Amino acid sequence: MDDLMLRIRSRFNTTLVTQQEAIRFLLRKYRSNEQFLVGFISDQRPNSQNLHNWTQFLHQDTAFAVGGEEIGKHVNAHYFFLHVEKPRRGHYVMTFKEVCPQDDKTKFPYTLQYLRMMEENIRKQPELWLWSHNRWKFNREGKAIH
C-alpha cells in the first residue's frame, strides 16, 4: 500500500518530503525566493506523542495536528483547503478554497477552520473520505480506545 501511495503521489513532477524533512525543506524553498505550493495530508490523526490539541470533529472528541499551521507561520504562508466532489463515477472536481478563520482568537485558527471545512466536505460525500486510518484511536489521556 505504501508503494502504491508513493507512486500515485509522486506523479506530475511533485516532490515528496517526509515529516522529519519538512521544516528544513520548506525553509530552504522559502529562502530561495522561488514560488512553491505545499500540500499537507492533514486528515489523519497525530501520533500518540502529539495528542496536545483537541476539538469536536464529526461529534467526536478529536486530536488534531498543527504542524502545517506552525510551519506556515515561518514562511508567511497562505492556507487553502482542497475541496473534492465526485459528480459521477471516475470524475472528480477539486477546488482550492482559501482557509479564512472566523475566530482568530484561538491558538490555531487556520487548523480549526480547515477541520470545519473538511467536516463539511465529509458530511456532503462521506464515501470520499478514507475511513481506514483510525482517526479516533486515542483518548485525551493517550490511551488506545480500540
Predicted regions, residues:
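Non-catalytic C-terminal accessory region of glycerolipid acyltransferases
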Residues: 20-146
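Membrane-interfacial amphipathic helices and adjacent loop/beta segments
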Residues: 1-21
